[in-house]
């Protein structure tokens, strides 16, 4: 297969995209990036036939977890810029749990990114901006043959996000938008990505079992069981830089919209703004990267009798979303392979809080599974092999000795 990433200036998909790896660049090397990188190493030898917590599939559409390769990373923190990615994920204010051993030298140097509004009033108290000029983002993405760019910029980085999106479009990469700046759900940007022949999965990454997905599920349960939801709240506290940054309430507008819509879109009736409160509450340093979510729902049941529900959820915040990102970048890669452009309807609805189209999670998952099956790299290889004869067909199906169904050589399961 070709090693080009098929930049939009040359091709918008098809055979040029169908190499064996998913080449990923990261914008923002914080706790979420750390969990993402750790997750690739933790599950690199996972059995494709086994279910892994937090992943739709170990092998998604022909791409194993280990098929994700990091090509570039960008940050503005003086404690991270210039370091190898394998060191930067443990540097600065990063404080997530260490659940996997990551080599110190991954061969990826963290480049100086663009600041714009990425460093807010509170973050600037803890993070010192690296000196020097912004790196040539477009040139780096092209030179490294990057397929997909993942954004982990801080909440409230409106200008910075849109600046990076312009670089991504010019470089010809797919985009996974993990933050609450609205790109995929906006017609303007959706049209821009379609015109460029590039896919986007967004906006605002869900967690495996996070406050929003739990809140959505409970709100949907009330609806399905005929309980009228009258009031609801979600209060979150944590000890990472995300929560510290969100002490600056002016940066929270899109975050509150994203989390609120994710819940209210599922209840089946309109709710007054004063009856719904969803958002971050406070920063508690000793929680580190842990997050506590306090959720309450108040409703009316049979006979107009009150029915109230309250729970507390405790999670490690960043690993909770890492598996979702692993699925998102692989879906984005499948779209690149086949020239599917614009926001990806199923994957965005299932994996993100603020997609272009909201829908119940079970429907969104089914749509995503259909997307994976339709654009599977295995399916494409099988069709090619069928045209070439029985031997090639056996190779593509994984029936040839020592070959997996995704066409790669078999490998014994090793240490996670």
Predicted regions and their residues:
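N-terminal glycine-/serine-/threonine-rich beta1-alpha1-beta2 phosphate-ribose binding loop
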Residues: 2-166, 252-257, 293, 302
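Active-site-lining helix/loop region of Rossmann-like oxidoreductase modules
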Residues: 27, 66, 80, 91-94, ...
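Gly/Ser/Thr-rich loops at beta-strand to alpha-helix junctions
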Residues: 28-34, 153-159, 179-185, 206-212, ...
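C-terminal active-site/capping subdomain that shapes the small-molecule cofactor and substrate pocket
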Residues: 57, 293-399, 404, 409-416
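Short catalytic-loop micro-motif centered on adjacent basic/acidic residues
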Residues: 149-151, 175-178, 201-204, 232
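Rossmann-fold NAD(P)-binding glycine/threonine-rich loop
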Residues: 155-167, 179-199
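Rossmann-fold dehydrogenase core element
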Residues: 192-205, 226, 230
């Amino acid at each position: 297969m070709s090693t080009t990433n098929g930049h939009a200036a040359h091709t918008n998909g098809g055979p040029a995209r169908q190499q064996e790896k998913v080449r990923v660049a990261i914008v923002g090397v914080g706790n979420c990036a750390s969990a993402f990188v750790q997750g690739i190493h933790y599950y690199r030898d996972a059995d494709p036939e086994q279910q892994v917590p937090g992943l739709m599939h170990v092998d998604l559409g022909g791409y194993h977890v280990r098929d994700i390769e990091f090509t570039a990373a960008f940050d503005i923190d003086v404690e991270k810029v210039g370091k190898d990615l394998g060191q930067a994920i443990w540097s600065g204010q990063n404080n997530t749990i260490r659940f996997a051993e990551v080599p110190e030298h991954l061969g990826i140097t963290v480049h100086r990114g663009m600041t714009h509004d990425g460093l807010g009033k509170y973050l600037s108290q803890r993070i010192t901006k690296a000196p020097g000029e912004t790196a040539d983002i477009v040139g780096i993405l092209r030179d490294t043959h990057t397929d997909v760019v993942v954004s982990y910029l801080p909440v409230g980085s409106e200008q910075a996000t849109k600046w990076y999106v312009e670089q991504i479009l010019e470089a010809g990469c797919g985009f996974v938008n993990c933050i609450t700046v609205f790109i995929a759900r906006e017609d303007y940007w959706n049209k821009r990505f379609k015109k460029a022949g590039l896919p986007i999965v967004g906006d605002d990454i869900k967690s495996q079992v996070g406050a929003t997905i739990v809140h959505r599920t409970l709100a949907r349960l009330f609806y399905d069981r005929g309980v009228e939801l009258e009031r609801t709240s979600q209060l979150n506290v944590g000890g990472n830089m995300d929560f510290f940054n969100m002490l600056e309430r002016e940066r929270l507008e899109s975050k509150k919209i994203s989390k609120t819509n994710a819940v209210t879109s599922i209840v089946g009736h309109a709710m007054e703004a004063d009856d719904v409160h969803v958002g971050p509450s406070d920063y508690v340093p000793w929680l580190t990267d842990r997050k506590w979510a306090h959720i309450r729902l108040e409703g009316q049941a049979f006979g107009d009798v009150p029915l109230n529900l309250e729970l507390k959820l405790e999670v490690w915040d960043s690993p909770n979303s890492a598996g979702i990102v692993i699925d998102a970048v692989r879906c984005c890669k499948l779209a690149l392979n086949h020239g599917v452009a614009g926001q990806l309807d199923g994957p965005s609805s299932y994996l993100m809080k603020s997609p272009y189209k909201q829908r119940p999670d079970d429907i969104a998952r089914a749509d995503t599974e259909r997307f994976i099956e339709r654009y599977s790299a295995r399916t494409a290889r099988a069709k090619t092999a069928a045209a070439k004869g029985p031997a090639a067909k056996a190779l593509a199906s994984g029936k040839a000795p020592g070959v997996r169904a995704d066409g790669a050589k078999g490998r014994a399961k090793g240490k996670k």
